[in-house]
Amino acid sequence: AEQTLRTKSVVVAAGAWLPRLVGQHVSLRPLHAVRAQPSHFAPRPGFDDIEMWPTFIHRGLSAQPEVENSWYGLWTPGEGVKVGSHLVHDELDLDNRSFEINRKFESALQEYVAQWYPGLDADKVTSTTCIYTNEPNEHFILDRKGPLTVCSPCSGHGFKYVPAIGKITADLAMGGTQSVKEWQF
């Protein structure tokens, strides 16, 4: 149903679609959206304390030399340990997004897991795709212009800071100002 809602302010947190939605109202830094492909790996039998799995960021080489990388991982209840890449992604066309799994990259993740994480079964993998958005300096865009608050924590990078980002965004929406220059428009 169509409805008109009038408010004193609005928050737009639209990820890769942010330039299309607010680009005519504010001057944004460029955003680059790519197709990321994290995978979930099952624990090996006998690895009973999987819920205690630490979140990690690992800068290093995979078993495939052309894939120098920064890897991340975290326990996801019901799915296993999520492992992904911060640096290696496929280019993305937002209007024609593919959900097809890149088997070469999945293989690189499997080899990495087999090399570094003996508690995980590299053969028991479930991969998915998602959109990963960044700006050139990997900073956030959290700012306000008039009644418009823009929140772009830039995908996985911002996920680590959700409580702080939420607090800052709420403050901006209520009339606060942004003092961190790197996060301004």
Annotate the PLM regions.
Residues 15-16, 163:
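Alpha-helix N-cap/helix-start capping motif
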Residues 4, 9, 16-146:
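Active-site substrate-recognition segment that forms the wall
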Residues 14-15, 152:
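Glycine-rich, N-terminal phosphate-binding loop of Rossmann-like dinucleotide-binding domains
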Residues 114-185:
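C-terminal catalytic lobe of FAD-dependent flavoproteins
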Residues 1:
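A conserved short coil-to-beta-strand element within the FAD-binding core of flavoproteins
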